């Protein structure tokens, strides 16, 4: 044991920072490594926190800080320190920085510190235990919402621009009435998992799908669903919209939305009429889009199936050998399926990304016009003026379809400068949609396929 006052410990980090922590909820546990880089052993007389209000410390299994005394670390050895944050409800709605210092006093007289910091955020908690059913509900932008289990809205559901809805593991939202979710490009509605920390240093938990269940719009009556600029991220099912109606069917409109990174389906349309515009539906382990029963028009929509296309294993499931889009027109009891894609992109890393399951191709009522398609089966009379992927193609469709975690480069389904989807859209189709999902103009230009107009 050395009492040389020049010897000191080394730490895996000088400042341990937590992402936003919901008040009264607690954080995930972070790890701090304490090293003795010296040849001789060092003794830690005492470990303590300056304040001790928000942070909880565990050293090699000991959680009582009064007993964190006379700890020895041999030369070249290390020990684990585990730290959590528990922040009491705040007096205001804005995030508040909470900080503390973790002190290590050595027997040689030297004291070292590690800074601890986290942002606390008040949150509205819903369905703390089991299922909660309400007759109507409005999600505002004042505070984030945390859904802990199954939240059922039996009547009208409203989501205001800028609303943030965080879903705990296995949590889901059921809407059985009309839905009016009006986000904007500047203030989108965000629905995502409640893990705000990181899976690895370079990988946020948001990048791992399956962290919550899904959104379900279900009814036995012809409801109206209006969604604008709603981002639904990293669940099991992005958006399931279905009914038992035969006629008239519920009406769904989606504009400027993003459904991304789900371990099952992205968008499921069953017995519903839908208009989907300027929307990205991407990276789902099963179908990105599944349609069965109803009239569905997709215009300037990007469907990109690159789930798990990376060199790091962060997903709990593997990509199924399914197409990005599956259109089911085989049922003898459901309403006829009439699904059309215009000025869209449907692609992925598997060979065939579009399946139209119908008894007779020539009688299928849907159309495909002005699209970029990766498919080896869709050569129907109603598919015209499309550009098809070829095995000899060497140019990239998107800015980035491969997650490069070491470089912190995530998927980006905007168009590459040489993308074959540039300038292939139908101008008449594009007229009612003069701007893309990012707000860039298509007016006076030959429109690109997909929800993003290429910006030189």
List where the protein language model places each region.
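A short beta-strand segment in extracellular, disulfide-stabilized domains
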Residues: 29-31
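Asparagine-centered strand-capping/turn motif at beta-strand->loop junctions
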Residues: 34-38
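Short, solvent-exposed loop/linker segments at beta-strand-coil boundaries, enriched for Pro/Gly
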Residues: 48-67
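Short beta-strand/loop motifs in extracellular/secreted proteins, especially
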Residues: 40-45, 53
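Beta-strand/loop edge motif enriched in small/polar residues
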Residues: 8-20, 25-27, 65-411, 418-433, ...
